Amino acid sequence: MKVALVYNDKVETLAVVKALEKLLNARKIEIDPENPDVVITIGGDGTLISGFHKYQNLVDKIRFIGVHTGHLGFYTDWRNFEINKMVDNLTKKQPSSASYPLLELIITTGAGEKKKLLALNEATIKRVSKTLKADVYIRDQFFESFKGDGLCVSTPTGSTAYSKSLGGAVIHPRLKALQMTEIASINNRVFRTLSSPIVIAPDEWITIKPETGSDDHYVVTFDGYEFNHKHIKKIEYRISQHVIRFDKYQHTHFWNRVEDAFIGQPKDKQ
């Protein structure tokens, strides 16, 4: 087995990385950042997302394991004090596997060029200096005309991130669905929207066609990364044929993660 390590530069993280490297070397597990079988991220959910984008070209061949140096994350199963147990499991135990859907974006520019992107959490479109005006289509059928700050399309795992702060629903990651949420929509007689998050089935897709003009300048974000372009003809969003896979050696129920992250019930109520 070959592993790659992806980590942030925090002091507590670097200490965990140093200890983890010693454990892996002692167990004769090769650290290979070029062609790994497993990518271990040390940090938080943001670090895991960075690891996904670093190795997305290998996403069909590799699995991910997340070590959290803070509280338990949505993508990270292990805490920093559990790395001995994690390495033991790597060498002795057959893991179960969990796969989560990814979001595919196809951006078509005004010149007809196409750019394909993948996102683990979400993608947004905004206008740089003015209000975004765009027509929204579902399965290539017109749905609504939007005016506002922007639109966000998220995966089920991304539903606990930016989408939730926009009023979106929290969706279990076993559901292959996409969710679109509005960012500060403006409704009038010309631009009328549902003014509610929508969730679409895995065989459906969303197309956003921004209003075109000489002074257009749009920013498309995907998991915090940016694609800037002056003229965007349309963006298609759909569930990707690719998935991200995680090695699971210990199970934490999704709703327990949600409760721990957002509610934090006193233990005497459990």
Curated annotation (Swiss-Prot):
Protein's gene: nadK
Keywords: ATP-binding, Cytoplasm, Kinase, NAD, NADP, Nucleotide-binding, Transferase
Gene Ontology CC annotation, any one: cytoplasm
Biological role stated in the UniProt entry: Involved in the regulation of the intracellular balance of NAD and NADP, and is a key enzyme in the biosynthesis of NADP. Catalyzes specifically the phosphorylation on 2'-hydroxyl of the adenosine moiety of NAD to yield NADP.
Record-stated family: Belongs to the NAD kinase family.
GO function terms (MF aspect): ATP binding; metal ion binding; NAD binding; NAD+ kinase activity
Protein name (record): NAD kinase
Pfam families reported for this sequence: NAD_kinase (PF01513), NAD_kinase_C (PF20143)
Positions of NAD(+) binding: 45-46, 121-122, 147, 149, 160-165, 184
E.C. number: 2.7.1.23
Enzyme class at the top of the EC tree: transferase
Transmembrane segments: none
Primary localization: cytoplasm
Cellular location(s): Cytoplasm
Co-factor(s): a divalent metal cation
Organism this protein belongs to: Lactobacillus johnsonii (strain CNCM I-12250 / La1 / NCC 533)
GO biological process per UniProt: NAD metabolic process; NADP biosynthetic process
Catalytic activity annotation: NAD(+) + ATP = ADP + NADP(+) + H(+)
Origin superkingdom: Bacteria
Positions annotated as active site in the UniProt record: 45 (proton acceptor)
